[in-house]
Amino acid sequence: MQWRALVLGLVLLRLGLHGVLWLVFGLGPSMGFYQRFPLSFGFQRLRSPDGPASPTSGPVGRPGGVSGPSWLQPPGTGAAQSPRKAPRRPGPGMCGPANWGYVLGGRGRGPDEYEKRYSGAFPPQLRAQMRDLARGMFVFGYDNYMAHAFPQDELNPIHCRGRGPDRGDPSNLNINDVLGNYSLTLVDALDTLAIMGNSSEFQKAVKLVINTVSFDKDSTVQVFEATIRVLGSLLSAHRIITDSKQPFGDMTIKDYDNELLYMAHDLAVRLLPAFENTKTGIPYPRVNLKTGVPPDTNNETCTAGAGSLLVEFGILSRLLGDSTFEWVARRAVKALWNLRSNDTGLLGNVVNIQTGHWVGKQSGLGAGLDSFYEYLLKSYILFGEKEDLEMFNAAYQSIQNYLRRGREACNEGEGDPPLYVNVNMFSGQLMNTWIDSLQAFFPGLQVLIGDVEDAICLHAFYYAIWKRYGALPERYNWQLQAPDVLFYPLRPELVESTYLLYQATKNPFYLHVGMDILQSLEKYTKVKCGYATLHHVIDKSTEDRMESFFLSETCKYLYLLFDEDNPVHKSGTRYMFTTEGHIVSVDEHLRELPWKEFFSEEGGQDQGGKSVHRPKPHELKVINSSSNCNRVPDERRYSLPLKSIYMRQIDQMVGLI
């Protein structure tokens, strides 16, 4: 009996030890028992790209003196001179090696919880339900705007009334930059109505725009916002109406005489004064639609605002056969491009349009720069101008060299997951430890160039933040694992990247992500007459504003994510979305210049005096069909896009678990 008691005692002792270890390593992190990496170091531990790491930095007991995630460390010596494919060897970071997730309970919780939740088929019935929910979300917001706000620009969804420019406070740029007293929400939503197949409402809305909207207004608006929201929507709707194939149903307008195109031209002419009297060719940020550039206007503008006009202005020029609009937009892009750093190839985020001096030296992927990169690539896709692709490729390489942190590969190896940080444009040194919600567009852009693996990892990071808060805070500090700016104005960028990643991989994981986003929006932002901005992502208090991009982008991308049979996917026409989510068909018509030569003062030459080769439409077709993007590998369909250990690692790094 004694030996039985001894054996029983040993068994109980072993079970007790297992229980203690499980509490420490399993529950510990979720209960906050471990020391999170952001609290263990400060900015004084940052080193210059050429400086050695401090051998004593970092928490006591950490092997190798690792002080935190490799995001805080500059790229390895020589990284700025070599492409991303060169191996990076960052420190393991607080998240440790690749099998760290297993140590913290990955195997001990039975079948993997990520596999359980996300992998496998997404039932067709559930998909249809989510599609209808997305459509209902749009209809609820749109109908309430028409009932309570039209013809004003926006809907105040809590008090069920309209909102226009703030005439009492001209300095209220958050409102006045966007609202021009031209029924903004109605105009911005036109092509969403078409994509959802609502021909009767689309036709009614177009007639309302033609009959009631005028740009002869004493409104001072931001050139960028008026271009992407209004000009882009008018051009998109015009192309839908005049498309001989009518893939979305009968969207034709009886006796339509190109009125939307003429309205787009009228608006663009009113924006042209922004490009006059600037010593650099970079436009003023704002114009008055009646009088032109205000006399007391600011000479400083952001790179994205000045350099993201080429798609809309280029489409307008090519439809009208008038090179003026594309010329001024392209001149601005070239002027900004020529101001990039000679050392890093990076651009800043704020520039003086008269001196060309960089006022804001931060280089990142978020506010102030985001759509500049986006439109370099999309301009090439639409117009086939080779120089646009060359600029984009050079910019993308600089981004990889100086902004990207973390391990080399998304889905293998040790170290922290990839992240793109904000750096000084001249030195490449880290400037701060936050990212903003606009940066969530970048995985979608990476999909367009075929860098799907990196897109998967970056998207997973933003999705982890969404899971933690049920929204994306406007600015999130990855060092402190907390929001720096707490509001969420119903932005679409994460949804956009989710949609594009699903199109690239057909992985049901992204349908689950879309469902999470839909349910969060319904739970936290739906109010009496629409969907409201979240004032505070933690306490979920709301603000009385529904921005127009909620209907033009957020609802549209959610709907398309779940509508597998939508003509966007099945009609055989290739479509591209503008930075405001307006749909544009990619066809040879836009790749043919209706004028003899462009930039005539350059004589058809580049700055080096060499003749510029413009690929012909048939050459572009070969170039653009040479990738394997149309073939989805089976492993992308039936397994998680990111290994569970890396998903868990990312969730840990944002404080989710």
UniProtKB/Swiss-Prot annotation:
Keywords: Endoplasmic reticulum, Glycoprotein, Membrane, Signal-anchor, Transmembrane, Transmembrane helix, Unfolded protein response. Its main location: endoplasmic reticulum. Residues 1-4 are cytoplasmic. Residues 48-94 are annotated as: Disordered. Glycans are attached at N181, N198, N299, N342, N624. GO terms for biological process: carbohydrate metabolic process; endoplasmic reticulum mannose trimming; ERAD pathway; mannoprotein catabolic process; positive regulation of retrograde protein transport, ER to cytosol; protein targeting to ER; response to unfolded protein; ubiquitin-dependent protein catabolic process. Residues 26-657 are lumenal. The chain crosses the membrane at residues 5-25. GO terms for cellular component: aggresome; endoplasmic reticulum; endoplasmic reticulum membrane; endoplasmic reticulum quality control compartment. It is found in: Endoplasmic reticulum membrane. GO terms for molecular function: calcium ion binding; mannosyl-oligosaccharide 1,2-alpha-mannosidase activity; misfolded protein binding. It is a single-pass type II membrane protein. Interacts with DNAJC10. Interacts with DERL2 and DERL3. Binds to SEL1L. Extracts misfolded glycoproteins, but not glycoproteins undergoing productive folding, from the calnexin cycle. It is directly involved in endoplasmic reticulum-associated degradation (ERAD) and targets misfolded glycoproteins for degradation in an N-glycan-independent manner, probably by forming a complex with SEL1L. It has low mannosidase activity, catalyzing mannose trimming from Man8GlcNAc2 to Man7GlcNAc2. Belongs to the glycosyl hydrolase 47 family. This is ER degradation-enhancing alpha-mannosidase-like protein 1.
